[in-house]
Amino acid sequence: MVEATSCGGVVIYKGKILLLYKNFKNRYEGWVLPKGTVEEGEEHADTALREVKEESGATAHIIKFVGTSRYNFMTYSIFYLLYIY
């Protein structure tokens, strides 16, 4: 069984939530929050900030921990509330 952890954020900018358009092999897969896999030795909060920057170009800071989302295939995501500055 494969287990993976990813972290991301609910990013707020000027009162709006940042969503990313997910497209895989030219197929629309919906709108998603920015998130990605934790690298070895990386803290969850650092992963969230790095992934927001990599996927959206936004520099943000963490306001608070929001929660965890678990998926059936043994992965889970950790989300933080972030504001862009």
Language model features with spans:
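Short, charged/polar surface micro-motifs in flexible loops or helix N-caps
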Residues: 12-17, 25-27, 39-40, 68-71, ...
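Detector for glycine-centered tight turns/loop "hinges" at secondary-structure junctions
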Residues: 15, 57, 75-76
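Active-site-adjacent beta-strand/loop module that shapes the phosphate/pyrophosphate-binding cleft
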Residues: 4, 61, 68-85
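N-terminal strand-loop-strand
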Residues: 1-33, 60
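Short amphipathic alpha-helical surface micro-motifs
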Residues: 1-2, 14-15, 45-47, 64-67, ...
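The catalytic Nudix box helix
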Residues: 33-66
